């Protein structure tokens, strides 16, 4: 049993595969357990997962060492690298603002070139991913999910990448009870901050179009569209912080007794 990281289950699975044991997917429910009851608890759980997976990537990298097949190496590495999405996601949410505020090019290209090359690639990759994932995952909800976590997992994952021995195991709170409906301002303040920045960029971009005769209108419009997309995602992420009152007296799990 691996004890060097805070995600001992994933690390133990990696070690078992290295020793020649096989993994199998069984398409039937064999166990049930409680999930986190609030967004704050869910984020704390994912912080531990993210830190632990990056620790494994540093301490017992699946791309190296003996015992794994190439598909296993790719599968484990993909699961670990996934949790490094925090910083790229934050950069994506801030990327259109330098041009809107300071006329600084993030993508040094004309509006026509962006329409000709960037947009087709984005559309193609989105459709391809959705086709591969079928109805099991949906691109837009995945973006919202990553946006919710990005602000909070960025620092822990970067620290684990630099110094994998830092960090401690924190037990995920489960079985708690929400006695009233409330909005978690503490968790949502990061999203609200990004909403304010993007909304300010939207207003200033429209102001530049209206007042600057030399403004590159098409590029400004592309960045405004980018900002509007960010606002849609951030608005949905903020809405998740609304915690509903629980009316059930105890958790219930569907089962079939034969």
Model regions: which residues?
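Catalytic donor/gating beta->alpha subdomain of glycosyltransferases that bind UDP-sugars
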Residues: 2-81, 119-170
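Hydrophobic, membrane-facing alpha-helical anchors
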Residues: 62-72, 97-104, 175
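Short membrane-interface loop/juxtamembrane segments of multi-pass integral membrane proteins
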Residues: 170-183
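Membrane-embedded multi-pass helical conduit in multi-pass membrane proteins
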Residues: 82-168, 183-258
